[in-house]
């Protein structure tokens, strides 16, 4: 009863985003799997599966794709991240095999990747796009801090004000399905630089959230859009 009125109110407050089918294809990876059972014969092995939400554009079977940040490559004392290159062998959404999937909802993507790469959600938090359409990979973030007025509490905890960031403080960063930890390397007024332990792949202007460890839990303290703006001390 009155569902039409409820939907109208929701649309008026939180409009459905414009999901163009012709835009740059972008998918947030939330899960990744190895679907092969123990004892399977080599000829029956299947490639890795990734699952998530297409947020822009569309993808089709046969598309060449990149998954970033990808895999960690160690060269002596230096570490770099290398995007994974592969192709889409199959798409499934709602239990149905598809030739093309568009933005909105969840889907699973079959690839020829080594299942060892995708097992146990190892690719969770990564981003999938076509060659030349991949967002930047960020190992450092320069933020114009937008801290909340109060820290969100639960249970018997008391809400309190949020103190400014401190040099070398460790924060948790969330960007879409990705989670990383960053160390505050520089602060100036309401701006700060963070060095990330794990890089994130995100479009410029996309929003990240910041959480601070309070006791044994992480508490949301602020947010900021990703930007190329550099912090000058």
Predicted features by range, described:
Residues 125, 208-211:
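Short, aromatic- and glycine-rich surface loops/edge beta-strands on solvent-exposed regions
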Residues 26, 85-87, 181, 220-223:
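Well-ordered beta-strand positions in beta-sheet-rich domains
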Residues 1-123, 127-134, 139-149:
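Conserved catalytic-core segments of large NTP-driven translation/proteostasis enzymes
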Residues 183, 201-206, 216-220, 227-228:
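Charged, surface-exposed alpha-helical interface/stalk elements
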Residues 34, 72, 199-201, 215:
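Conserved beta-strand elements of beta-rich interaction domains across eukaryotes
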Residues 129-203:
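Basic, glycine-rich polyanion-binding accessory segments appended to enzymes
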């Amino acid at each position: 009863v009155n569902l039409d009125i409820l939907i109208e109110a929701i649309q008026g407050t939180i409009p459905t985003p414009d999901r163009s089918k012709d835009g740059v294809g972008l998918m947030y990876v939330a899960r990744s799997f190895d679907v092969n059972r123990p004892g399977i014969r080599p000829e029956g092995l299947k490639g890795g599966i990734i699952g998530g939400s297409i947020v822009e554009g569309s993808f089709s079977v046969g598309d060449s794709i990149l998954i970033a940040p990808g895999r960690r490559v160690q060269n002596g004392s230096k570490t770099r991240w290398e995007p994974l290159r592969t192709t889409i062998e199959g798409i499934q959404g709602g239990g149905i095999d598809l030739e093309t999937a568009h933005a909105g909802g969840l889907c699973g993507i079959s690839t020829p990747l080594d299942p060892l790469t995708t097992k146990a959600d190892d690719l969770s938090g990564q981003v999938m796009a076509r060659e030349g359409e991949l967002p930047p990979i960020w190992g450092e973030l320069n933020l114009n801090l937008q801290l909340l007025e109060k820290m969100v509490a639960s249970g018997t905890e008391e809400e309190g004000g949020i103190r400014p960031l401190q040099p070398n403080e460790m924060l948790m960063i969330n960007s879409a399905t990705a989670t990383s930890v960053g160390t505050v390397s520089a602060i100036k007024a309401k701006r700060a630089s963070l060095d990330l332990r794990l890089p994130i792949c995100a479009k410029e202007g996309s929003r990240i959230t910041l959480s601070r460890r309070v006791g044994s839990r992480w508490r949301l303290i602020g947010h900021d859009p990703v930007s190329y703006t550099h912090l000058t001390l």
